[in-house]
């Protein structure tokens, strides 16, 4: 390492999506250092979100209905207390966002305009600037952060490791434009987003491989429910990477899914085009595996009104040479969200002292086995705020000097390289899984994860998904195994440390998946 950044009594926030930005704003006027890999708010899934924020604020809606929809989508694995708490926090979240400068869409009478998305029983999705909601929200929050004197922003800086002393957070090993440095810190909030970049077909920023999960796991944090990876049913099918998302709000306005014969294949399924994402994604995947294409037909439902209702999607379609008002839109599933992550409590605390985690990096139990549409931005904002409030209510930690950082922290860490990992993950950890594929994934990923090379960090995250998936010998929510296609009578969440993951991986590598019996449950 080339230098130490001087010690300050600030809280360090890693990541500048919704969770990180809301945590920073909530902590003000306490000092915050916000560290972000790119530009503030840039290259974040939050900024790319076309959907809005689910909030049961409509005249025909109430929190209990939103809770019921969330529990149904989660397929038996939701933490009901977390669901009730986060859903009930929606009014406070919306108020905080509006005070920060977000302007949600309203009608001529000044009332909120609510959209409908899959598996919601009511129109309860709030948008800002239509299908550009994520960009509008993040833009308002980044402006607010830059206006706040207590927040220092460090852009273009990647955190390579969390440093601990006696299992307590002591600092961060970072790499920036001027080289590597150590950043002493005793309070860290990880909010680095998801892991879609592990897959070839994703709607996430391609560089997002689960950095926060890796950092926390290497620091000793417990992981939860890592097998649950959500595939959005309708990404625009094209050579573009990452794939462009076609929000399910389009289906909420009446667009239909057709196979290449022009047949509506979702009509007989409960919920039809607005069934939960796992069901729709598997149905589309089956059609594609039969050798066909799948199309979204918005011609009758929206027609010439498509561009005004969904300007961002209209532009993406036209860039691909498609006029969605007059033509069918080819779609395919793509990785969109990860329900698992670093296990946290209702205040965002991880199992490592001094480490809080919020947003998609965390696993709170809100989503269970399958996320309900537009609950992610709600959770990110709510848990960013909760983590900040928990830190703000604590006594100031004792200052740690650079000398307190462990001696092995002076080693440089290689930047991540996904080239060796992405093909394995895309082939074996997709929409449909089975024992042989999971065994091959574990066999190929384990040596990569145990080495110190550039593939090691993404391989740690990918191996965790594979091990959790191999241990779950049932199909539930977004996790589907064609060799265990039924759901167990008893729902069980699972929590493992990285040491547990590696131990299980070695067991699987030396024995049959069918007889391996290691399982640590929540």
Curated annotation (Swiss-Prot):
The pathway is: Cofactor biosynthesis; NAD(+) biosynthesis; iminoaspartate from L-aspartate (oxidase route): step 1/1
Keywords tagged on the record: Cytoplasm, FAD, Flavoprotein, Nucleotide-binding, Oxidoreductase, Pyridine nucleotide biosynthesis
Kind of enzyme, top EC level?
oxidoreductase
Site residues (Important in orienting the L-aspartate substrate), renumbered to this chain: 117
InterPro entries, per database record: FAD-dep_OxRdtase_2_FAD-bd (IPR003953), FAD/NAD-bd_sf (IPR036188), Fum_R/Succ_DH_flav-like_C_sf (IPR037099), Fum_Rdtase/Succ_DH_flav-like_C (IPR015939), NadB (IPR005288), Succ_DH/fumarate_Rdtase_cat_sf (IPR027477)
What EC number(s) has UniProt assigned to this enzyme? 1.4.3.16
The record's annotation in Gene3D superfamilies points to: FAD/NAD(P)-binding domain, Fumarate reductase/succinate dehydrogenase flavoprotein-like, C-terminal domain, Succinate dehydrogenase/fumarate reductase flavoprotein, catalytic domain
**Disulfide-bond pairs as recorded:** none
Q: Which GO terms describe its molecular function?
A: L-aspartate oxidase activity; nucleotide binding
Q: Which locations, inside or outside the cell, does it occupy?
A: Cytoplasm
Cofactor dependence is on:
FAD
Query: What are the catalytic residues?
Result: 277
Q: GO cellular component terms?
A: cytoplasm
One Gene Ontology BP term is:
'de novo' NAD biosynthetic process from L-aspartate
Looking up PANTHER family in the UniProt record yields: L-ASPARTATE OXIDASE, L-ASPARTATE OXIDASE, CHLOROPLASTIC
Q: What is this protein called?
A: L-aspartate oxidase
Q: Which organism is it from?
A: Agrobacterium fabrum (strain C58 / ATCC 33970)
What gene name does this entry carry? Answer: nadB
